[in-house]
Amino acid sequence: MTILNARNLSLEEVHRLFGFQKQYNDSFSNYLSLQPLTEAEQQELKQIQDDFDRYLTAGKVSEGQVKFLAVAPLLRLAGFYRYPIEIVLEENIADIEVEDEDIKIKGRFDILAISKAKHTKPQTYFWVLLIESKNSQIDISTGLPQLLTYAYKNLDNQKSVWGLTTNGRSYQFVYIEEGNPPIYYLLPELNLMERERSSHLLQVLKAICQL
């Protein structure tokens, strides 16, 4: 049996191994109810932008810094630190076996938000949002194969999963849906450093947190 690491898979390989089909959706409102931000939220968002921009100006922002300076503050502001949400960091996924090709895939996700108030199966919590982060100089699309691989395993437990791949500046949300074949929808790319799209980013995170 061939053992692969999800980090090394290409998007083409993920499509072939799991049968994923890619589609595009140009509106978050097809999935989420987006609410206006308060003045306090807008001010905190501006502070996150300013903090991250200082590091961007200095040069490359590492993956760890992206998580600490951008992702973590955004999740806190969106409500992900409050019950019933629980944040899980850098845990190994259960091995994924592709029997037709005699392949076993291993991997470790970056950040997973689960709901402690919802079970999909006994001892299995509902996945609210799966996040894959990269350093600021890497295109966000490079995180998509890992994201889809980790989400695919959980489609046995729930009908759909929200995913997000980010380099701190750009944010690509993905709506992943079970089916034969499974489908993932790419939503419009958002950007922390642009006023309108950063507000939209926080609105989306808040809406996902309420699922």
Residue positions per predicted region:
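A short, conserved, highly charged catalytic patch centered on acidic carboxylates
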Residues: 2-3, 11-160, 176-211
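Short active-site-adjacent structural elements
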Residues: 171-175
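Central hydrophobic cores of alpha-helical transmembrane segments
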Residues: 165-167
